[in-house]
Amino acid sequence: DIESYLNIPSDSPYEPGSVMKGITYAAALDSGNYPYNEEFRAGTFSYTYDESTGKISRTSGSTAYPSISDALGNDFGTISYDEGFIRSSNVGICCLLADHLPAKTFEEYLNRFGFFTKVDIPFVANAAGVKNFSHPSDILSTGFGQSSSVTALQMVQAYSAIFNDGVMMRPYVVEKIVDSYSNETIKS
């Protein structure tokens, strides 16, 4: 009897935060761009951007672009990318995107994971979210879950591919649950 309602998981795009890091790492792994056994310097990421090539390059010192830091000012020192994932390092994501995972490849993976388009699910209104790749800081920030917005439904769908050997499952609405042996309805 509800005439108007908002389904927050499907209708309300949000910046997902660190849960996006798993998607960024999955894109690097699947595309063959993951830097196994390499390390990076955590703490703060300063960079330059070459507009002609679209290349983001880490640099020391200040630049015209905003520096990106690990949360709460943490500085983990020099660590592996594996440890960067464990510690949820924003700088690790920036280094991954600047040095190993090209922005175009990252964007293609975000699209393949189903972000920024409505989820094909009957009976459920949903939003597409917003891809913000306007500036280099937006590309980097999207990698650790800021700047671009997605829905919780899109995130669940994307993670289904990670947990299901690369096969993404489309969410669906369950009308009822039926016991396969007795054919009795368990719940409707």
Q: What is each PLM-predicted segment?
A:
Residues D1-G17, I23-S188:
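Beta-lactam-recognizing serine transpeptidase/beta-lactamase-like catalytic domain environment
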